[in-house]
């Protein structure tokens, strides 16, 4: 099986990320699911992967550039997977070990030092430990983890696509 060109693959990766972000916005504004700090961090990482893919598709680099974008996309996707993995881990903690709930992120950005707010965004709060939605027995953070791992593998696959 031959892969489409690297440019086409990067564009498809970008479109998949855009669909993930559109789904997140749909669940927030139509489904009434308010995102927790880790959910917002995951959205930022999906956006970062999307921007890497879009830059690669627009730039249309030669072999070395394709490999650089492939590694960058994989690294960013694995960073997102680590955030999703922490979120899934928080969901499976016993109730007595769940961190305390904190104020909303907009309040934290206005009233707390930036470092404390970023720490809350990356480590999660008690809000991150409740399951509001499942599909096929998996929570939304578990599905996002699967998507990040798939995006990372898809990006890394472009390494070999650069040889064509």
Swiss-Prot record:
<dbReference type="InterPro" id="IPR050183">
    <property type="entry name" value="DsbB"/>
</dbReference>
<keyword id="KW-0997">Cell inner membrane</keyword>
<dbReference type="InterPro" id="IPR023380">
    <property type="entry name" value="DsbB-like_sf"/>
</dbReference>
<dbReference type="GO" id="GO:0009055">
    <property type="term" value="F:electron transfer activity"/>
</dbReference>
<keyword id="KW-0143">Chaperone</keyword>
<feature type="disulfide bond" description="Redox-active">
    <location>
        <begin position="36"/>
        <end position="39"/>
    </location>
</feature>
<dbReference type="GO" id="GO:0015035">
    <property type="term" value="F:protein-disulfide reductase activity"/>
</dbReference>
<feature type="transmembrane region" description="Helical">
    <location>
        <begin position="45"/>
        <end position="61"/>
    </location>
</feature>
<feature type="disulfide bond" description="Redox-active">
    <location>
        <begin position="101"/>
        <end position="128"/>
    </location>
</feature>
<feature type="topological domain" description="Periplasmic">
    <location>
        <begin position="27"/>
        <end position="44"/>
    </location>
</feature>
<keyword id="KW-1003">Cell membrane</keyword>
<keyword id="KW-0813">Transport</keyword>
<dbReference type="Pfam" id="PF02600">
    <property type="entry name" value="DsbB"/>
</dbReference>
<keyword id="KW-0560">Oxidoreductase</keyword>
<dbReference type="InterPro" id="IPR022920">
    <property type="entry name" value="Disulphide_bond_form_DsbB"/>
</dbReference>
<keyword id="KW-0249">Electron transport</keyword>
<feature type="topological domain" description="Cytoplasmic">
    <location>
        <begin position="162"/>
        <end position="164"/>
    </location>
</feature>
<keyword id="KW-0676">Redox-active center</keyword>
<keyword id="KW-0472">Membrane</keyword>
<comment type="function">
    <text>Required for disulfide bond formation in some periplasmic proteins. Acts by oxidizing the DsbA protein.</text>
</comment>
<keyword id="KW-1133">Transmembrane helix</keyword>
<feature type="topological domain" description="Cytoplasmic">
    <location>
        <begin position="62"/>
        <end position="68"/>
    </location>
</feature>
<feature type="transmembrane region" description="Helical">
    <location>
        <begin position="69"/>
        <end position="85"/>
    </location>
</feature>
<comment type="similarity">
    <text>Belongs to the DsbB family.</text>
</comment>
<keyword id="KW-0812">Transmembrane</keyword>
<feature type="transmembrane region" description="Helical">
    <location>
        <begin position="10"/>
        <end position="26"/>
    </location>
</feature>
<dbReference type="GO" id="GO:0006457">
    <property type="term" value="P:protein folding"/>
</dbReference>
<feature type="transmembrane region" description="Helical">
    <location>
        <begin position="143"/>
        <end position="161"/>
    </location>
</feature>
<feature type="topological domain" description="Periplasmic">
    <location>
        <begin position="86"/>
        <end position="142"/>
    </location>
</feature>
<protein>
    <recommendedName>
        <fullName>Disulfide bond formation protein B</fullName>
    </recommendedName>
</protein>
<keyword id="KW-1015">Disulfide bond</keyword>
<dbReference type="InterPro" id="IPR003752">
    <property type="entry name" value="DiS_bond_form_DsbB/BdbC"/>
</dbReference>
<feature type="topological domain" description="Cytoplasmic">
    <location>
        <begin position="1"/>
        <end position="9"/>
    </location>
</feature>
<dbReference type="GO" id="GO:0005886">
    <property type="term" value="C:plasma membrane"/>
</dbReference>
């Amino acid at each position: 099986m031959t892969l489409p060109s690297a440019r086409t693959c990067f564009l498809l990766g970008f479109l998949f990320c855009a669909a993930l972000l559109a789904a997140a916005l749909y669940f927030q504004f139509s489904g009434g699911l308010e995102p927790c700090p880790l959910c917002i961090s995951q959205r930022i990482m999906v956006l970062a992967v999307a921007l890497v893919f879009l830059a690669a598709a627009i730039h249309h680099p030669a072999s070395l550039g394709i490999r650089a974008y492939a590694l960058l996309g994989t690294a960013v996707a694995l960073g997102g997977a680590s955030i999703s993995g922490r979120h899934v881990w928080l969901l499976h903690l016993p109730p007595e070990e769940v961190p305390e709930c904190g104020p909303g992120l907009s309040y934290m950005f206005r009233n707390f030092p930036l470092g404390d707010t970023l720490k809350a965004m990356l480590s999660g709060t008690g809000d991150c430990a409740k399951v509001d939605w499942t599909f096929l027995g998996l929570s939304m953070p578990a599905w996002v983890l699967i998507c990040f791992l798939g995006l990372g593998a898809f990006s890394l696959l472009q390494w070999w696509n650069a040889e064509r």
